[in-house]
Swiss-Prot record:
Protein name as it appears in the record: Photosystem I assembly protein Ycf4
Main location: membrane
Cystine pairings recorded for this chain: none
Keyword Transmembrane helix (UniProt): yes
């Protein structure tokens, strides 16, 4: 039974890099808010610098607008992290003859079912340079290639090759792209 089913978890947006970016945007937004309030009130609310010396119009006002923009961006980033957008699984079931690719979307879950007989090959794509892309995808008859790897940080090349070869062996199809 275990040889008939392969399930691969996919990491979503709940990663350390995303949490650090959201924290930095939050801290920066709070800093701009305190600088704007310091300029408006005429006394320093920040331990660094001397923001009370800034003229409220236009400098303090612009910093207040920056703090609002940072608050909106931080709210979006924390919501994406809390929902864990992009997480899910790839489930390959030989017994049922179906592949189920499921991901958590922003508003609702996304699930795609592909008949096992429509899979032509497993494709490993490696593109280095400015816009690096390393992914494993399924070449499906009558459809675009279906990506299986997570979005964001590229996988190490050795792990990418191993995952592609293991999946091609399990499905009994060719491995392309190496």
């Amino acid at each position: 039974m275990a040889a008939e089913l392969l399930e691969q978890p996919v990491l979503g947006s709940r990663r350390l890099s995303n949490i650090l970016v959201a924290a930095m945007v939050t801290i920066g937004g709070v800093g701009f808010l305190f600088a704007s309030l310091s300029s408006y009130l005429g006394r320093d609310l920040l331990p660094l610098g001397h923001p009370a010396g800034l003229v409220f119009v236009p400098q303090g006002l612009v910093m207040g607008l920056y703090s609002i923009a940072a608050a909106l961006l931080a709210t979006y980033l924390w919501a994406v992290i809390a929902i864990d957008v992009g997480s899910g699984s790839n489930r390959f079931d030989k017994q049922a003859g179906v592949i189920t690719i499921s991901r958590r979307g922003f508003r609702k879950p996304i699930s795609v079912e592909i008949p096992l007989k429509d899979v032509q090959a497993v494709k490993v794509e490696v593109r280095d340079g400015f816009n690096t892309r390393r992914r494993v995808s399924l070449r499906v008859q009558g459809r675009r290639d279906m990506p299986l790897t997570r979005v964001g940080e590229p996988l190490p090349l050795a792990q990418l090759e191993q995952d592609g070869a293991e999946l091609a062996r399990f499905l009994g199809v060719n491995l392309e792209g190496l």
